[in-house]
UniProtKB/Swiss-Prot annotation:
Quaternary state and interactors: Component of the CCR4-NOT core complex.
LRR repeat positions: 22-43, 45-66, 68-89, 91-113, 114-135
Top enzyme category: hydrolase
The entry's keywords: Activator, Cytoplasm, Exonuclease, Hydrolase, Leucine-rich repeat, Magnesium, Metal-binding, Nuclease, Nucleus, Repeat, Repressor, RNA-binding, Transcription, Transcription regulation
Binding site for Mg(2+): E220
Enzyme Commission code(s) on record: 3.1.13.4
Cofactor(s) annotated in UniProt: Mg(2+)
Cellular localization per UniProt: Cytoplasm; Nucleus
PROSITE patterns, A to Z: LRR
Name of this chain's protein: Probable CCR4-Not complex 3'-5'-exoribonuclease subunit Ccr4
Catalytic activity: Exonucleolytic cleavage of poly(A) to 5'-AMP
Origin: domain of life: Eukaryota
Length: 476
């Protein structure tokens, strides 16, 4: 246990003002405290809080604001009830609650997936909590039954224009990172039954069919799941044709069926496929003299095997060309330079393809693993990147493109497309060319719902990403 700084009987506000963030904890044990001041919860940097041996009867729910807390000692008080929001203190590793008057346990404590020390001895626990604690299964039980929150609002189409021509020809596109089973089963915060592969794929299928877009782009689809389930089920239920491409490592693995990749689906009645192309980012990178001469960049890139799928369609009603790009860029936030390199390759390849067709429309969508303030986003939407970042990335040349792409969700207040206990942000996008007019977008998830949970997946969402979709009109 880290040494607790001895700050007894200090005013909370003066503690915050006079002590730097080097102080890891506070010790207010045996001080006769009956109430906790809200000022305490402003000390969000502390990792350890000792409130043992006081006269506390209630713990304010706002204690969860101490998001960095790893050790919380509330033993030897007079506490009868635990606030459910303690379950949002996901960094807790040790929680001491012994010698209180606690009889019931909120299921939300099951979200404390990092908690390895949980003591609640000498409390009048009711059944089944008393027996579960003896068997060291109490937190596990809470995790499996942590379903005490209401569903989100129904997702609806939000019009982006006031007046529509009812005779206009529109089409819809959607993107959805469905979270691979390999990644899902390693998560510690959702109930394990929520992560069951069969349960998840049925929920994913239900989500897809309920939105029922004309063109669907999925990421993190495992090869066996595509071949054995999604390909046939989506053709049967939604009348989709499809194409799938696993990540590059599938070429060298014996068990290639477990490798995930990108899958693009389209309505057979509305589109005729002309061509499908694959962008293997590693292959393009390692064979490009602009990149492979940079030893540091080559070392950082390693064997990252991300891919993108380019599908060229003829729209059946109008005979116009539509290019749809399904992409999944590298995930790690520590590798902004690699994601930017992948974006350069992506836009250059897309520009080459677009020049092969007369006035094509373009929809570029997927999981870009990049925020709106990133170089990837500004490069795609503004064809720009700061000199500072160019120097930092050590690219060695000034990239550019002539594609005019806009973000379909730019005007929508959207707090996240990916939500986990450690990250909440917008990293999935739908970009479209100036030959298209945006007509509608699928509504996002309200903050009121997110306040109830520590992250996705959960009982309402089978992936840690949400489905994004847009409707477009072809310009004449």
């Amino acid at each position: 246990m880290e040494e607790i700084q001895n700050l007894k009987k200090k005013n909370y506000k003066s503690v915050q003002k006079n002590y730097s963030e080097d102080y890891l904890g506070l010790d207010f044990s045996y001080q006769g405290l009956k109430h906790l001041s809200y000022s305490l919860f402003q000390l969000t940097f502390i990792k350890e809080l000792n409130l043992k041996g006081n006269d506390l009867e209630n713990i304010p729910g706002d204690i969860y604001i101490l998001k960095n807390l790893e050790i919380l000692n509330l033993s030897k008080n007079k506490i009868k009830f635990l606030p459910a929001k303690i379950g949002k203190m996901i960094n807790l590793k040790e929680l001491y609650l012994s010698d209180n008057f606690i009889s019931n346990i909120p299921m939300e404590l099951g979200s404390l997936y990092n908690c390895t020390v949980f003591e609640i001895n000498n409390n009048p626990l009711i059944s089944p909590f008393n027996l579960l604690y003896k068997d060291k299964k109490l937190l596990q039980y809470c995790r499996e039954h942590n379903t005490n929150y209401g569903p989100p609002a129904d997702r609806t189409w939000l019009d982006t224009v006031i007046k529509k021509d009812m005779s206009e020809i529109t089409f819809s596109c959607g993107t959805y990172n469905i979270l691979s089973n390999y990644s899902a089963v390693r998560l510690g915060y959702p109930p394990t039954w929520v992560l069951n592969p069969d349960y998840r794929k049925e929920n994913i299928l239900h989500n897809i069919c309920s939105i029922n877009v004309d063109i669907l782009c999925l990421q993190e689809v495992e090869t066996y799941n595509y071949e054995d389930f999604y390909k046939d089920q989506l053709e049967l239920r939604c009348e989709y044709s499809s194409v799938f491409q696993p990540k590059g490592r599938s070429k060298n693995l014996t068990d290639s069926k477990s490798v995930d990749g990108c899958a693009t689906f389209w309505k057979k009645s509305k589109f005729k496929i002309k061509e499908n192309l694959v962008i293997d980012f590693y292959s393009k990178f390692i064979n490009d003299y602009r990149f492979n001469k940079n030893i540091n960049l080559v070392s950082r890139y390693g064997k990252k095997d991300n891919i993108a799928l380019i599908s060229i369609f003829e729209i059946s009603q109008t005979k116009q060309t539509l290019i749809v790009v399904n992409v999944h860029l590298y995930w790690d936030p520590e590798y902004e330079d690699i994601k930017f390199v992948q974006a350069i390759i992506l836009l250059e390849e897309l520009e080459k393809v677009s020049k092969c067709y007369k006035n094509p429309s373009i929809v570029l969508l997927g999981d870009f693993n990049s925020l709106q303030n990133s170089s990837v986003y500004s490069f795609i939407t503004q064809n720009s990147v700061s000199n500072t970042n160019l120097c930092k990335y050590n690219i060695g040349f000034i990239p550019g493109h002539f594609l005019k792409l806009s973000d379909a969700y730019l005007s929508e207040e959207n707090d996240f497309t990916n939500f986990t206990p450690t990250f909440k942000g917008v990293i999935d996008f739908i970009f479209y060319s100036d030959t298209l007019e945006l007509r509608s977008i699928l509504s996002t998830i309200e903050n009121e719902y997110c306040d109830q949970v520590v992250g996705l997946p959960n009982i309402h969402f089978p992936s840690d990403h949400i489905f994004l979709a847009s409707k477009f009109k072809l310009k004449k």
